[in-house]
Regions:
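S-adenosyl-L-methionine-dependent DNA methyltransferase catalytic core
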Residues: 1-52, 201-424
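Core alpha/beta nucleotide-donor-binding catalytic domains of modification enzymes
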Residues: 2-145, 151-168
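A generic secondary-structure signal for well-formed alpha-helical elements
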Residues: 70, 101, 105, 155-158, ...
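Conserved S-adenosyl-L-methionine
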Residues: 75, 152, 180-192
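Short, amphipathic alpha-helical "lid/cap" segments that border enzyme active or binding sites
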Residues: 131, 135, 171, 408-415
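Secondary-structure boundary elements
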Residues: 140-144, 176-182, 207-218
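Conserved Class I S-adenosyl-L-methionine
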Residues: 163-183
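Short glycine-biased active-site loop of nucleotidyltransferases that positions the nucleotide triphosphate
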Residues: 193-197
Length: 424
């Protein structure tokens, strides 16, 4: 049995992890993946010695990326193909079932505290019930380990049962359905596993009761997982500053000719000034830009007329009105904001290419992060393949796939813990 990782379980550096390739040795455990996305999280399991026996992803573009990297059979719609997946997996002595249901309706932005307590509201979005489909697969296949990952609100969301007769929180439904398993459910920040971003997520780990109790306890405690890094980025610039500089003002400056993922959207005219007038390394917002006419910086945020000289502050986010005047754009202080240079990155999201979104601007350069930088901050190894067919429209779809993924460093460390559990 094991209780924690030892010094021999340490990996030398974050850079070494990014340089990892798929293992060529015989697989050490098996897994199936539901709501697999592009297979980014599954890639970490493969790096740890896992063999994917089945995946399920409804979007053809994401499924294509999964196939290019994982090579497992991929089913489409879990609701309509669930029976086929169960038939395929039964009798295979599955070690792990991992499920990452769609999270949009559970997210902080779309699930205010009051709505989190409203099961009727939850019932209006059919995606909220998809985890029930995963539970049915788990109950019928009976893998040794079941792993759910989702946004922080996921476990506490009140929801109705599929027949509408029972109301409870998601974590209560999970525990009730998996009664033959020991359970651990919690919200954690993946930075504690050495991912260089603030990424708070719900995780729920279930270990079948026939697994040794002490061994199961260590598997369910992320602090005990092997694969910790001896060297890791202290801040965002430590992680990404080795890449060529980019600038969003001109097309020839906005892309790296040697890396199709290292490119950024263009911002011209006043939009570029909203970014360029934010001091580098300041962590400030364009709402705080000094007046470009007189240099005064005392005008309060969300105001676009200088209180000293009375001129329009075109370098702050605004909308031009029919009469020629401007009004401030409605938004939050964290929109149009540089990331802090001396901290790890904020959460990588599917909206990484939108500079108006929350904390999306590079700490020192005049642009958003590139998809390559987002991939690094999500701890996605360089060996992960991005087929050309999925890199259209300046890789916006790649950005979505990156933002919604479980960081492979997390699943790699979980996979290493599974290997220790199964070989104890």
């Amino acid at each position: 049995m094991f209780t924690a990782f030892t010094t021999k379980d340490l990996m030398p550096s974050f850079a070494e992890f990014l340089a990892k390739n798929k293992p060529k040795r015989a697989p050490k455990f098996t897994f199936a993946s539901l709501f697999s996305g592009a297979g980014i999280g599954d890639f970490g399991l493969v790096l740890a010695g896992g063999k994917c026996l089945a995946a399920c992803e409804i979007d053809p573009q994401r499924a294509a990326v999964h196939k290019a990297n994982i090579g497992a059979p991929v089913w489409g719609n879990l609701r309509t193909e669930k029976a086929s997946i169960i038939k395929h997996l039964r009798g295979l002595d599955l070690d792990l079932l991992i499920a990452t249901p769609p999270c949009q309706s559970f997210s902080t932005a779309n699930s205010r505290r009051g709505l989190r307590e409203d099961p009727d509201h939850a019932g209006r979005d059919e995606r909220n019930n998809l985890f029930f489909e995963a539970l049915e697969v788990a109950r019928k296949v009976k893998p040794k380990i079941v792993f759910f990952e989702n946004v922080p609100n996921f476990l506490k969301r009140k929801i109705q049962s599929q027949d509408g007769t029972v109301v409870g929180r998601v974590e209560e439904f999970l525990s009730a359905a998996l009664g033959g398993y020991r359970a651990h459910a919690n919200v954690m920040c993946f930075s504690s596993l050495h991912v260089p971003q603030r990424r708070r997520r719900s995780i729920a780990i279930f270990v079948r009761n026939d697994i040794d109790k002490t061994t199961a306890a260590a598997l369910m405690d992320p602090a005990c997982w092997p694969g910790a890094l001896k060297e890791r980025p202290a801040n965002i610039l430590d992680a990404i500053s080795h890449l060529p500089e980019l600038d969003s003002s001109q097309a020839e400056l906005a892309a790296d000719a040697d890396d199709p993922l290292h490119q950024v959207p263009l911002h011209e005219g006043v939009h570029y000034s909203w970014i360029s007038d934010i001091p580098a390394r300041s962590g400030r917002s364009s709402w705080e830009n000094a007046c470009s006419n007189c240099g005064d910086d005392s005008t309060p945020i969300f105001q676009v007329v200088c209180q000293l000289c009375g001129q329009a502050m075109l370098n702050r986010p605004h909308v031009l009105q029919k009469d020629g005047s401007i009004r401030p754009i409605k938004g939050f202080k964290t929109s149009y904001t540089r990331m802090a240079a001396d901290q790890i990155a904020p959460t990588m999201t599917t909206a990484s290419g939108h500079f108006s979104s929350d904390l999306k601007l590079h700490p020192t350069q005049n642009r958003v992060l590139s998809a390559r930088e987002c991939a690094i901050l999500q701890a996605i190894p360089d060996s992960f393949v991005w087929p050309k067919e999925q890199r259209f429209r300046k890789a916006y779809l790649v950005r979505e796939m990156i933002g919604e993924a479980v960081p492979p460093l997390v699943t790699f460390r979980f996979g290493k813990a599974i290997v220790k559990t199964l070989t104890s």
